[in-house]
Amino acid sequence: MRQILEHLLTKQDLTREKAFNVMLSIMSGEHDDAQISGFLMALRAKGETVDEITGFAQAMREKMVPVSLDSPAIDMCGTGGDALGTFNISTAATFVVSGAGVKVAKHGNRSMTSKSGSADVLQALGIPIDKPVEESTKDIEEIGLGFLFAPAYHPAMKYAIGARKALATRTVFNILGPLCNPANVKAQIMGIFHPDLTEVQAKVLKALGSTDVMVFHGHDGLDEISTTATTKISQMQNGGDVNTYEFDATELGMARHGVRALY
């Protein structure tokens, strides 16, 4: 870890292999909270690259509990962290998409920044959030919508909890979670908390094997496709190039509203 820290403190990027190895060692419990905290803050100060995030995600995927599906599914989630406290929009959207006939492997957790996370919403509706892998798989295959509760599928994250709580600030883990769907979906819709990360995250998903993705950030600060402002979207279709563009919901005839309408 010392060599990695020196590397980061001198603003040198890690190769994908080095990023993979350091995250694998963290997920294996080889470092204490102080070392992990130092690593996370040095990385944040330097700024994360596509290769670094890809390597980290590959290591986390290696440690996760996998879900095997017989047919394609999509994930719909956000990083959170927009600090606007809206209702859980991505979870509501999953019911619409699933109702339209698209299978959804919803990967999520409890609230970190909003009024409620996907797990909180489902629990309030009386839906069990900690089903065995077999039951969640059956839900996705037969009903068209299943919930994959992140803590149950990423047990190795326990080694980073102490450092994350002590730092109490955004780190690379905030963008890694949505990249590590246990069902290894190839199609994904993702909201992100900063506009500079839409293209980065889309390129990481491409490197991880995704074929169809949309990563977006509303210019009102939302990690959603917004109806209160224009939205920056980075999109990849059929494994092609990542294209970034601006989207305005009013072009589809939707009225502009204030963010407070989403509370």
What kind of region is each of these model predictions?
Residues 7, 62-65, 86, 101, ...:
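Glycine-rich anion-binding loops and their surrounding alpha/beta cores
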Residues 78-83, 108-114, 153, 219-220:
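Acidic, glycine-rich active-site loops and adjacent beta-strand->loop/helix elements
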